[in-house]
Regions:
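Short, Lys/Arg-enriched N-terminal segments with co-localized hydrophobic residues
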Residues: 1-7
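HAD-like aspartate-dependent phosphatase fold
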Residues: 7-129
Length: 129
């Protein structure tokens, strides 16, 4: 469904939001912020396979979330229990738009920064990197 992205052939750094992108969003709406430690994170269909595909290709997987830094421990536990693999976790980035700015490499063709917007809870299974 998504057009493949043509950029440099080197491994890439993939920034991925957690809630509504890799895992179902409704669980947080049902439980609320005050019962965060009781959330049962459910990966969206195809998430685990896609993350392993990216990892096997040598890509760096960085998860981002608006969850506060104080929720790091429980978030890491939820990710592990759900089978979601990653290299880094960036917490507390808020709920506003995310903007990535990067320089173009003078000796290479192609973009060095890309944005993919997905409808909530559609997941990453059809994303081609």
């Amino acid at each position: 469904l998504y057009i493949g992205i043509k950029v440099m052939n080197k491994p890439k750094t993939i920034f991925c939001d957690i809630d509504g992108t890799l895992s179902e969003y409704p669980y947080s709406a049902e439980m609320g912020n005050y019962q965060f430690d009781k959330w049962n994170m459910k990966p969206l269909p195809g998430t685990i396979a896609k993350l392993w595909e990216w990892d096997k290709a040598g890509h760096m997987i960085i998860l981002t979330t608006g969850r506060k830094e104080g929720m790091r421990r429980i978030t890491e536990e939820q990710l592990e229990a759900a089978g979601i693999i990653y290299d880094r976790l960036i917490m507390g980035i808020g709920g506003g738009a995310r903007v990535l700015i990067n320089d173009l490499k003078p000796d290479r063709d192609g973009d060095t920064a890309i944005a993919i917007n997905l409808k909530r809870d559609t997941g990453v299974k059809n994303v081609k990197i």
